[in-house]
């Protein structure tokens, strides 16, 4: 049996998520053959992994930008007795 060329990865998170949602909808209709369902499932796993990696990268970037994930209270003693007010 000849293998199909694997579809390329979507360019961004939104495209991958949209494709994954469409794929799930097609599978939920229950009209695909077993072979087609397995191919769609395989594609869905790849898309889910891509989305998860994108989310992890975004979370890491947010943590980096916000000071390594440290919570910073808005009302700090330093801010109240500063010279800027």
Curated annotation (Swiss-Prot):
E.C. number: 3.1.11.6
Localization: Cytoplasm
Pfam families: Exonuc_VII_S (PF02609)
Biased composition (Acidic residues): 68-85
Top-level EC class: hydrolase
MF-aspect GO terms: exodeoxyribonuclease VII activity
Taxonomy, superkingdom: Bacteria
Key words of the record: Cytoplasm, Exonuclease, Hydrolase, Nuclease
GO biological process: DNA catabolic process
InterPro entries to which the protein is assigned, alphabetical: Exonuc_VII_S (IPR003761), Exonuc_VII_ssu_sf (IPR037004)
GO cellular component, one term: exodeoxyribonuclease VII complex
Keyword Cytoplasm tagged: yes
Region (Disordered) location: 66-85
Catalysis: reaction(s): Exonucleolytic cleavage in either 5'- to 3'- or 3'- to 5'-direction to yield nucleoside 5'-phosphates
SUPFAM superfamilies given in the database record: XseB-like
Subunit details: Heterooligomer composed of large and small subunits.
Function as written in the Swiss-Prot or TrEMBL entry: Bidirectionally degrades single-stranded DNA into large acid-insoluble oligonucleotides, which are then degraded further into small acid-soluble oligonucleotides.
Similarity comment text for this entry: Belongs to the XseB family.
NCBIfam families associated with the record: PRK00977.1-4, xseB
The protein's name in its UniProt record: Exodeoxyribonuclease 7 small subunit
Origin species: Thioalkalivibrio sulfidiphilus (strain HL-EbGR7)
Upper taxonomic lineage: Bacteria, Pseudomonadati, Pseudomonadota, Gammaproteobacteria, Chromatiales
Originating gene: xseB
């Amino acid at each position: 049996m000849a293998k199909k060329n694997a579809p390329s990865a979507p360019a961004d998170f939104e495209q991958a998520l949209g494709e994954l949602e469409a794929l799930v909808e097609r599978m939920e209709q229950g009209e695909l053959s077993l072979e087609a369902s397995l191919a769609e499932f395989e594609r869905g796993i790849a898309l889910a992994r891509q989305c998860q990696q994108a989310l992890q990268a975004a979370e890491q970037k947010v943590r980096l930008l916000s000071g390594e994930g440290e919570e910073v209270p808005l009302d700090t003693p330093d801010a109240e007795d500063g010279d800027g007010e």
